[in-house]
Amino acid sequence: FSPDNNRAIEVTKEKCKPLKNYNNPKLLWRDDRIPIAQKFDDPYFSLDNGFEEVRHVFLNGNKLSNRLNNGFKIAELGFGTGLNFLSTLWLWRQKKQKGKIFYTSFEAFPLQPIEMLKAQNEFPELSDLKDEFYSLWSKLLEKGELSGNDYTLRLILGDARRTIKQFDTQVDCWFLDGFSPA
């Protein structure tokens, strides 16, 4: 993990139960910090600053600082490391809004929880959220849903070309993310 990130948590297999029977994305790690999906030869987030990339493309690009409100629904193609979700929840909490946001993500190649946590060590801005979700990623991947006081997160595993057909919820915003060519 990043040696200069003093808030980095130790990721252990005891805390993050591995998933079985799923499509492993087979990762390479650039500088032991940035996950790259071998199948697509593409990093999961910007090599320069993934958090700033998410803020620019998704949060600011969708004007979410003005649009997020109680009951706001976001859907996403590609959960990846959870960076888009954590960044959205970060913005929601920065706004000190009352109520709840609803976030649904479709993922064909889910990362192991231990891989998600390793990748999240790159983002000191999200360290409190990373710590909060540390023990919950395994539960999300097993159950498909997490719910807290200010969010509901739903993860739908499988190829979105098939799984999205059962998704009949209207949303306020889509995050269309993916590997090159996206």
Model-identified regions with their sequence ranges:
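S-adenosyl-L-methionine
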Residues: K118-Q166
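Short, catalytically relevant binding-site loops at active-site mouths
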Residues: P110-Q112, R162-T163, P181
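A short SAM/SAH-binding and catalytic strip from SAM-dependent methyltransferases
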Residues: D172-A182
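Rossmann-like AdoMet
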Residues: T12-A75, S87-E125
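Extreme N-terminal basic, low-complexity initiation segments
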Residues: S2-V11
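Glycine-rich SAM-binding Motif I of class I
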Residues: G82-L86
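Conserved glycine-centered beta->alpha loop in an early N-terminal alpha/beta scaffold
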Residues: G78
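A short acidic, Gly/Pro-enriched loop at the edge of an enzyme's catalytic core
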Residues: K165-C173
